[in-house]
Amino acid sequence: MNEFPVVLVINCGSSSIKFSVLDVATCDVLMAGIADGMNTENAFLSINGDKPINLAHSNYEDALKAIAFELEKRDLTDSVALIGHRIAHGGELFTQSVIITDEIIDNIRRVSPLAPLHNYANLSGIDAARHLFPAVRQVAVFDTSFHQTLAPEAYLYGLPWEYFSSLGVRRYGFHGTSHRYVSRRAYELLDLDEKNSGLIVAHLGNGASICAVRNGQSVDTSMGMTPLEGLMMGTRSGDVDFGAMAWIAKETGQTLSDLERVVNKESGLLGISGLSSDLRVLEKAWHEGHERARLAIKTFVHRIARHIAGHAASLHRLDGIIFTGGIGENSVLIRQLAIEHLGVLGLTLDVEMNKQPNSHGERIISANPSQVICAVIPTNEEKMIALDAIHLGNVKAPVEFA
């Protein structure tokens, strides 16, 4: 192993590969980028925001070869001691991160029908990385595994039992790597005892979810069998009455596939506003008095507050509410409006602290005194994946989370 080992973190999406290279000793990011537009003539690779490199018609292995070439140019290839892969769905088979073996790959493939759009892409990334780095230990980190501590009453749907027992239909939850990282950071920031604590983490981005964390374990979460359930999101409807969808199908003649597209791609902030799924665009429109943009934001916030309050019922105590994700970290307006809804929980906002930019990093934004502490903690899923890889790979870990 090189004297200065690094972890390569890979996140293969349906049409892209996001990656980062982190120093094992510090978990500082040394290099990061994205290969996007896989299998199209417009595919490209961008490193550290530099000029894109043409990767026309490249598949996952081609793109990873290009990434490996960029590592070689920076004398980092021999330093790659570990590779961490983000895996979208682990089903009930994976309760924690694991070292990748042939058996693990077979088991990931078994649960992949639960998330076909992402898991098969994840597997393509694993296959390519194992081929390009055959001597490097590789680790799978599952977006669902943090939520495998949910009790049956929290994960079961009120459907006939055979759908659960035969098909695995249940709540799995997502954003687990983010919720796990942020809750761990919260114990330090808020000076809490992990073994006797209650947190609500609100991961708010284009995809959004709430997680109740009791004594260090996820006990409830808003996303379900798929990432569609729960909060209203950028283009996803979130919770919706199935009876309403059945009525729409009857009245319009739309198929199940049509309606899946509607609730996943045409709803949420975009659907209500008719303007954009980008909250930055909607906030500008909010201040300009755009009626439907204001209604979209109000609906988004109402759902956030309702889910935060509801998830508090899964805790034995409520010590803190944490905002994270692109919107949770950066939107002063969304945090302010959400906290105004949550006075019933004893939450009071410090308006000036809430206005601090995300460049300030981890910060408490509740007033003193406030019955419940509210904070903003920037998520770092890449770091959490790297830390899992370091731990499982038996490489000397940083003090943090060691």
UniProtKB/Swiss-Prot annotation:
Designated name of the protein: Propionate kinase
A Pfam family that the UniProt record links to this protein: Acetate_kinase
InterPro entries reported in the protein's UniProt record: Ac/propionate_kinase (IPR004372), Aliphatic_acid_kin_short-chain (IPR000890), Aliphatic_acid_kinase_CS (IPR023865), ATPase_NBD (IPR043129), Propionate_kinase (IPR024917)
Enzyme Commission (EC) number: 2.7.2.15
Provenance organism: Salmonella agona (strain SL483)
Ligand binding (substrate): 86
Catalytic activity: propanoate + ATP = propanoyl phosphate + ADP
Family: Belongs to the acetokinase family. TdcD subfamily.
Summary of subunit composition and partner proteins: Homodimer.
Name of encoding gene: tdcD
One of the protein's GO biological processes: L-threonine catabolic process to propionate
Gene Ontology CC: cytosol
Job description of the protein: Catalyzes the conversion of propionyl phosphate and ADP to propionate and ATP.
Residue numbers annotated as active site: 143
Keyword terms, alphabetized: ATP-binding, Kinase, Magnesium, Metal-binding, Nucleotide-binding, Transferase
Hydrolase in keyword set: no
Family matches, as CDD domains: ASKHA_NBD_AcK_PK
